[in-house]
Amino acid sequence: MIINLQELIALLPFLILLLTVVIVILSISYNRNHFFIAFLTIISLIVSLCSLYFLIAIVPIDITSLFHITKRSILYISMIIISSIATCVFAYPWLLKYAFNKEEFYLLTLISTLGAIFLTISNHMASLFISVELMSLPIFGLIAYSNSQKYSLEASFKYLVLSGVSSSFLLLGISWIYAISGNLSLLCLNQIFSDLSNSEKMMVLFGIIMVLMSFFFKLSMVPFHLWTADIYQGTPASVLSFFSVSGKIAIFSILLYFFSYFSVFDNKVIFLILSLISFFSILFGNLMAIFQTNIKRFFGYSSISQIGYLLIILLVSKDEYFFSVQTGGIFLLNYLCTNIVYFGVINLFSNSCDYDIDSIHLYKGLFWVQPLLASIVTIVLLSLGGIPITLGFFGKFCIFSIIIKNHLWTIGASFLIGTILGLYGYLRLIVNMYLNPSEQSFINDIKKSNFWLCSPSGILIFISGIMLLILGIYPNPLINLINSVQ
Amino acid sequence: MLLSLLVIIPFLSGIFSFFSFRFQKNIPRWIALTGMGLTLLTVIRIWFFEDYYTYQIQSYTHLSYQLILPWISSFGIQFHIAVDGFSIVMLFLTLFLGIIAILCSWNEIKKNEGFFYLNIMLVLMGTIGVFIAFDLFLFFFFWEIILIPMYFLISLWNQKKEDKKKCINIANKFFIYTQISGLIMLASILLLVLNYYINNKILTFNYDLLLIQPVDKSIEYIIMLGFFLAFIIKMPIVPFHGWLADFHERSPYCGAVDIIGALLKTAPYGLLRYNKMLFPNATEQFAPIAIFLGFLSMFYGAWVAFSQVNIKRLIAYSSISHMGLMLIAIYGGNEISFQGLIIQILSNSISTSALFILSGQIYKYLKTQDISEMGGLWTNIYWIPGFSLFFALSNLGIPGTGNFIGEFLILFGIFKEHPLVSIISTIGIIFSSIYSLNMIQKIYYGLSKHDFPKFFLNIKEFWISIVLIFALIFLGLIPQKILNISFESIHFIYNFSKRIQ
């Protein structure tokens, strides 16, 4: 296996992160310094984000047979890295109060990021499997990081067991496919599938469905969603902004890669399964979100429905590659920004307490205490609901036009009902912030910490919120950017 | 550039009034009022000094006064606003009622003034936007944007402190209804645009372009139905009227209520501007059903209004009843009835808003909206009973007021096309006189149930009522002025919708 210079340049962002991982490990074993490690991690993530610039000229490129980088994956990689940066920025003030070892948090985040970005570019079953594992193993640690808290260990354990099961599904699926095709490359799948006899096709199909099931588990689609709310509840807010975004973007990008190239997926069975999953995810996620009183659980269910909307893209991605990539980009960016703000705000409030402030009634009357912050959260919730002047509206608009253009009427119906149910849920949170504050001490505590905007996390939250608004009013730059990466 | 001011001024004044709240509590309302005044001046400037008439060059509408900026080019969406006579009339109505709304809430809103005026200005901005948008996406954009501030207006500034929960529920109900209507409309707009795209390979949301290319016959009906549903939910017409009465009962009685006068009128505007123009064939086919729905809501509204014990619900149902007549005018009428429709829209908004304002005044003194607890108020209150009598009579269409002209022209127009429809509609109007008189009788005449203290009408409300009365009488005596403004557009709309078939 010979790697030439060009491929090395293509691997630059990954190598930077790998180097950082090594430095962090060495630094932890030699001398623990929280500030240094946090600073190093954030800087290296930023450097690796910038180094993506060098990739633009040389993609598309194959790095051995394991990885395949395209312009589109650069987009997704940058989103994942941004979410990691946000996590580290949010986690720093949280970790300052943390009693035990602080530095491993960054190590775990870095490794998981590495796994996620490898997943977006992997082109081989082996690299796919390893990346998935690399991505999810550190997350057990991250979820359990605040292990002194209620639900934390439970969530971590749940995710550990279920993730293990899903990995075994993935492995099983891969081996089914391998048994027939004799090749682990993703590209060969397409070629082989056309030459097979019917019974063999069934077996490959079974394998593919197994692989998809594992992915849908990771994306927490219905019917593999039962863990979502519990794990969201038990996870610290700063971890959630990473957990909820990076894994989902990575897996979605690999799914989009699958579904836009391979004729395998013209198959009726897969189409049916996909539409059913999307149908029920939209309805179920939105319906359950209405009844939640814990805003972390709320976002868990709401993310199910958001990814449900996203799955609609996959149904048509082969015929309308261009448009579906554009839609996916808009939607995922919206998801990223909303996540950063949503969990950033929870984290901001939780910093003054020992535990996460995650109950709805604690946020009652927030607007009258922190108007700017509450306005940003309002924008985020409206964006999730898809109301004009936010980016979410364009995501919704694009998906809706896909539905109508391709006459997916059943999904369209669930989209309509789901959006309305979802809006009901989001409005509940919004109006809660505008009611008169109750007499509890929490809101009065916030009054003291008026300078949230000056902290790094505050700036990040502010920028993301404003981005949603600006891109919602004038999305041209974003659309041009996404079009230019194709 | 002048046109964009129509949207920019309300928006900025809303923002400023929100932030100025910190300095002094009185500033927001002044800023809001100034903003409305400036917008009104802009409209007058456009009306006097620009040639805004719609005229026709080879079946292509050309609005000589328009502003087109590229917005989202990859989807063919433009920031395209334009004004024609019809829009001008609706803009005058919106701004007139907007100013009155602000004046009414002058002293009534005692908490969070800044946020309240921000919401009011945003609603007005959205309404203005709906009237001047000539890009379907932009139209939808404004159509949806109204909902959020409206939601806050209903849910946060209710009259009684104790039923906060109920208010939020009603706000949710309103939101869900309108959201359904919005999503259906989005679907229809997309269908229309994609249909155009398939035929011409141009992705555009431009109203003028979509207008000249007839829609495929096979899906024209479906798209038309989508638009129709979206509009009649907002209007509201009977099967979809569930939100209106609750909404009126709970909304803050001064500010928001008047806006409703303007807000509800976006739906007849849309029906005339979009349904009638874009889908002439399907509209023609659909007309009997629409007329039937119009009858339904006309009679149902009137009968239910008769049995209400809550003043505001009564007025809300009377408004539903009048909306039925408007729907019949749109679908059953000819050019004359369209012109009557415009007068009817104006005068009905004014008289309904006036009744709401007066009922708000009564509520302020008696702390109840229940008609059965009132009675014999004529001896206790100065001015209000007289004004109420005038507005109630005007509402049922007494000669000399705008409503009479409106109803007369509508019925006259319909009679030429479908005599029977016109005759049945006339019967509907009889019921409206019954419930109006019943309301007046129960509230103001007879013996007092309780021993109320005597009180005067607020001096501000007094002048507002006087202005409204003059407006109605103006409409009733010199409707030609209004008809002149809108004549060309209405003429064009009518001819265009007839010519194609």
UniProtKB/Swiss-Prot annotation, chain A:
Reactions performed catalytically: a quinone + NADH + 5 H(+)(in) = a quinol + NAD(+) + 4 H(+)(out)
Keyword NAD: yes
A single GO cellular-component term on record: plasma membrane
Subcellular location as annotated: Cell membrane
Family, similarity comment: Belongs to the complex I subunit 2 family.
Keyword rRNA processing: no
Spans traversing the lipid bilayer: 8-28, 36-56, 74-94, 104-124, 125-145, 160-180, 204-224, 239-259, 270-290, 298-318, 329-349, 374-394, 407-427, 459-479
GO biological process, one term: ATP synthesis coupled electron transport
Organism the protein comes from: Buchnera aphidicola subsp. Schizaphis graminum (strain Sg)
InterPro entries (UniProt xref): NADH-Q_OxRdtase_suN/2, ND/Mrp_TM
Protein name: NADH-quinone oxidoreductase subunit N
Domain of life: Bacteria
Enzyme class: translocase
Subunit (UniProt): NDH-1 is composed of 13 different subunits. Subunits NuoA, H, J, K, L, M, N constitute the membrane sector of the complex.
Molecular function GO labels: NADH dehydrogenase (ubiquinone) activity; NADH:ubiquinone reductase (non-electrogenic) activity; quinone binding
Enzyme Commission designation: 7.1.1.-
Keywords: Cell membrane, Membrane, NAD, Quinone, Translocase, Transmembrane, Transmembrane helix, Transport, Ubiquinone
Function of the molecule: NDH-1 shuttles electrons from NADH, via FMN and iron-sulfur (Fe-S) centers, to quinones in the respiratory chain. The immediate electron acceptor for the enzyme in this species is believed to be ubiquinone. Couples the redox reaction to proton translocation (for every two electrons transferred, four hydrogen ions are translocated across the cytoplasmic membrane), and thus conserves the redox energy in a proton gradient.
Annotated Pfam families: Proton_antipo_M (PF00361)
UniProt membrane topology term: Multi-pass membrane protein
UniProtKB/Swiss-Prot annotation, chain B:
GO-annotated cellular components: plasma membrane
Compartment(s): Cell membrane
Keyword line: Cell membrane, Membrane, NAD, Quinone, Translocase, Transmembrane, Transmembrane helix
Domain of life: Bacteria
Signal peptide coordinates: none
Keyword Transmembrane: yes
GO biological process, one term: electron transport coupled proton transport
Coiled-coil parts of chain: none
GO function term, MF aspect, one: ubiquinone binding
Entry EC no(s): 7.1.1.-
Catalytic activity entry: a quinone + NADH + 5 H(+)(in) = a quinol + NAD(+) + 4 H(+)(out)
Record field: transmembrane: 1-21, 30-50, 86-106, 115-134, 139-156, 174-194, 222-242, 252-272, 286-306, 314-331, 341-363, 374-394, 420-440, 459-479
Top EC class, one word: translocase
Membrane topology category: Multi-pass membrane protein
Subunit structure: Composed of 13 different subunits. Subunits NuoA, H, J, K, L, M, N constitute the membrane sector of the complex.
Functional note: NDH-1 shuttles electrons from NADH, via FMN and iron-sulfur (Fe-S) centers, to quinones in the respiratory chain. Couples the redox reaction to proton translocation (for every two electrons transferred, four hydrogen ions are translocated across the cytoplasmic membrane), and thus conserves the redox energy in a proton gradient.
Family in the record: Belongs to the complex I subunit 4 family.
Name the UniProt record assigns to this protein: NADH-quinone oxidoreductase subunit M
Encoding gene, per UniProt annotation: nuoM
